[in-house]
Each structure stands twice: as structure tokens, then as C-alpha cells.
């Protein structure tokens, strides 16, 4: 198991009954779906994406709309992984990309391990149901339940970037793969919602402690040909919660929507 005890950072052993236990006696039950909850009790309440957002994203991604990004991530992971690689998807959501990466790794005959975590319990439940071969946990990017240098390849796909934790868990020479939206991503969607649609801001690619190996762009036009697909895309974005009702109605009354899809995939190496 790639995960460590979130309380003492000690290694975890999995008992026959599924519990994960450290040498100090801290114990974590495995949920029936197969994941562990490593959010500490003092972080109670609801965290991350709610069930509605998770279901919308799952429905949208299952159409294959973001498959070019998924294939790029899989190819990049395979390029740098070995049989001994410990691969971690930080902020993996409902596990769409994590699942495809694990399947590609398996098809290649590799013994590399693929794990993921997300702060949303609803999201991790669906990820665990989708692929029982994944090691999954509820956890925060700002307090990863992983030992120092315990990750060979770390992915961050539209997740919060906690740079100190990223550097802590990534071994020297390890790879960090990060996907972000480019400037025109979903501009067609925003053009329907807002009178003055805005472009995304892309920050400087330089990150402390990491050497940039590659910067690859993915760009295409996506046509959504049903109200259900348009609704799924909208509901999985933050725009669903900060858009006036009249604009929502205007978007959701459309039968067809064309929008720009733009991503940037950065690959970094942890400096020694």
C-alpha cells in the first residue's frame, strides 16, 4: 500500500479483515466499496465535489469528450513508468483518468501500482466501484497520506496544487504530470452564459524544486448534441454554482453546443 498513517506517517499493514493498521495502533476500516478514509476527524463536514457534480462529471466523461486528454496522460505515464513505479493520482475525483491509466499499465504487462485519492467521499466511492484494482483513499492534497519520497509518478489533473506536499511525497528524479485548462477552454460555453465571456488565466509554468521536461497542448472543438450532455458539462463545472438562473436556462434550452476544448499537460522532474 502506498498510503501511510495520516496521524503518525507510519507505514500501514492491511489485516485479513481489511483494516489498515500502523505500528502505533492507529486503525482505519476499509469501506465496503474498497477505499479508506484518511481525513482526520477534526476535518468533519462535507468536502470536495458533491454527489450531483460527481454524477454529472462521470456522465460527461463517459461520453469520451475528454478522451484525447486521457490518452495523453496514459502515454506520458507509460513513457516514464517501470515495473516498480508507484503511481499516484492526487485529486483523482471519480477516477476516470486513474482507471484508464491502471488499465493501460495492466495491458502493458507492467507491475506498477496505481493509486488515487480525493477529498470528496462521493467521488472516491464511484472510483472504487469502477476499478477494484485501484488503491483509493479519501484524503486532502494539502496533507497527503504518503511517506516522504514515496511516489515515483504523481498526477494532478485539474486539482489544487499543494507544492510543498508535492515536493515532499515525490522522490528525487520522480515525475510530476499536471494538466490544466488552457486560455480558451470552454469559451463557447461561457459565451452562452455571460455577456462578457472571459478567458482563463494560465500561470507561469515554473515550479520550485521541479524541472520542466515538456509542455504539450491539446486543442479541439467539441460538439454536444443533446441537452443531457450540455447539462452534464455545465453541472460538473464551478459555473453551475455562480451563474444567474436566466443564463442557466438559456444554456440548458440549447439542443446543440459547440465549445473550444483546450488543455496543457506539463511534465516535471523532481530535482535532486
Predicted features and spans:
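N-terminal auxiliary segments of SAM/dcSAM-dependent transferases
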Residues: 1-46
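Class I SAM-dependent methyltransferase SAM/SAH-binding core
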Residues: 86-89, 94-143
Amino acid at each position: 500500500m502506498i498510503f501511510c498513517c495520516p496521524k503518525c506517517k507510519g507505514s500501514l499493514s492491511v489485516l485479513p479483515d481489511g483494516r489498515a493498521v500502523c505500528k502505533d495502533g492507529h486503525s482505519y476500516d476499509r469501506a465496503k466499496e474498497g477505499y479508506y478514509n484518511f481525513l482526520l476527524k477534526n476535518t468533519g463536514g462535507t468536502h470536495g465535489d458533491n454527489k450531483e457534480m460527481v454524477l454529472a462529471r462521470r456522465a460527461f466523461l463517459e461520453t469520451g469528450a475528454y478522451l484525447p486528454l486521457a490518452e495523453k496522460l496514459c502515454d506520458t505515464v507509460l513513457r516514464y513508468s517501470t515495473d516498480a513505479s508507484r503511481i499516484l493520482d492526487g485529486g483523482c475525483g471519480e477516477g476516470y483518468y486513474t482507471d484508464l491509466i491502471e488499465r493501460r499499465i495492466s495491458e502493458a504487462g507492467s507491475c506498477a501500482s496505481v493509486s488515487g485519492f480525493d477529498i470528496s467521499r462521493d467521488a472516491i466511492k464511484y472510483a472504487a466501484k469502477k476499478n477494484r484494482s485501484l488503491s483509493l483513499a479519501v484524503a486532502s492534497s494539502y496533507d497527503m497520506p504518503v511517506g516522504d519520497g514515496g511516489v515515483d509518478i504523481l498526477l494532478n489533473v485539474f486539482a489544487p496544487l499543494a507544492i510543498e506536499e508535492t515536493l515532499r511525497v515525490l522522490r528525487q528524479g520522480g515525475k510530476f504530470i499536471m494538466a490544466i485548462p488552457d486560455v480558451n477552454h470552454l469559451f463557447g460555453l461561457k459565451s452562452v452564459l455571460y455577456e462578457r465571456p472571459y478567458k482563463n488565466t494560465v500561470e507561469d509554468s515554473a515550479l520550485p524544486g521541479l524541472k520542466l521536461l515538456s509542455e504539450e497542448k491539446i486543442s479541439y472543438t467539441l460538439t454536444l448534441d443533446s441537452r443531457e450532455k450540455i447539462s452534464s458539462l455545465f453541472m460538473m463545472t464551478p459555473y453551475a454554482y455562480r451563474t444567474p438562473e436566466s443564463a442557466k436556462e438559456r444554456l440548458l434550452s440549447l439542443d446543440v453546443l459547440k465549445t473550444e476544448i483546450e488543455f496543457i499537460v506539463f511534465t516535471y522532474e523532481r530535482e535532486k
